[in-house]
Amino acid sequence: MKLNQNLKNLLAPTKPKVQFANKNISKDIILYMDSVSVSFDGFKAINDLNLTINNGELRCIIGPNGAGKTTMMDIITGKTRPDEGSVYLGQYTNLLEMSESEIACAGIGRKFQKPTVFESLTVYDNLSLAINGNKGVFASYFGKWRKLNGEQNDFMDNVLHVIGLEHTRHYLASVLSHGQKQWLEIGMLLMQKPQLLLIDEPVTGMTHGEIERTAELLTDLAGEQAIIVVEHDMEFVRQIARKVTVLHQGHILAEGTLSEVQNNRQVIDVYLGGGH
C-alpha cells in the first residue's frame, strides 16, 4: 500500500541533536563505513570494507555464505567491534563509541531472518511494547506500556496501516501467518522511528503473495528510512533493488545495478555461478 504524505511525515525518523560533524562524510550519507576490518582467531571476516548508504536508500547486499554479511551488520549494531576502521550514522554519530542499546536508540533497527515477536501478545500489544521499549519487558508485562497517549495511538494506527495489519490488531501474534509475523516485526521497528533498517533475508519461507507484499512494503518505506536488505532470493532482489552490493571474503567485490553485478565475471565465478 502506497504511503500518503501524512503517513510519510509520521514515519519520518527523529533527527539526532547536532554534534561535531565528520567532515569526510557528505550530509546525504546515513551510513559510513571506512576501512573496516575484523578478525576472529586469525580469520579476517571483514577485510578493509568501505561502504556508504545514502539517506532513504534501499540497498541489497548479496554474496556467498561466509562473505561477511552478518558480521557487517553485527558491526553496525555494536554487537561486534572492528579491529580497524570508522563507522558513522550520518555525519555526527560515531557508532564505535556506543553500546548496542545506544545504537538502537540512535536510530538503527535490525530484523533477523526469523521473526521475533511475542506470540502470546496481540498485534496491538507487540507494537505498544516496541514504542515503549525503553521501559523494559518486565514493566511491559505488567501493563504499564498500555497507557498510550492520543498521539502514540494515532501513530500506531498509521503503522498498522502501512504494514497491512490494521484488521488483525487484536489477534494474538501466534495466529498470524509467517509473512504477517515478519511485517509485524518490521512494524515494531517502525514504532521506534529508525533512520536505518537492517533486514536479514525477510522473504525466506513466505508465500508468493507475501513476497510480493513485502517487496511493496520495503520499496514504499525507502525514502523515509534507509534500508539494507541482505538476501539470497535473486528474484526478490530484482523486485526491490536499485543498487546491489556484492560481498566476498569480507570486502566489496562489485557494486551497481542488479544487471551490472549479474554480468560481472568475478561475481559469476564466486557467487552466481553456484545456481543463484
Segments (PLM) and residue ranges:
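Conserved ABC nucleotide-binding domain
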Residues: 96-97, 159-175, 180
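ABC ATPase NBD Q-loop/coupling interface
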Residues: 86-106, 143-146
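Helix-to-loop junction immediately C-terminal to a conserved catalytic motif
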Residues: 77
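The feature captures the beta-strand-to-loop junction immediately N-terminal to the Walker
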Residues: 62-64
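Conserved structural motif at the start of ABC-family nucleotide-binding domains
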Residues: 26, 31-33, 46
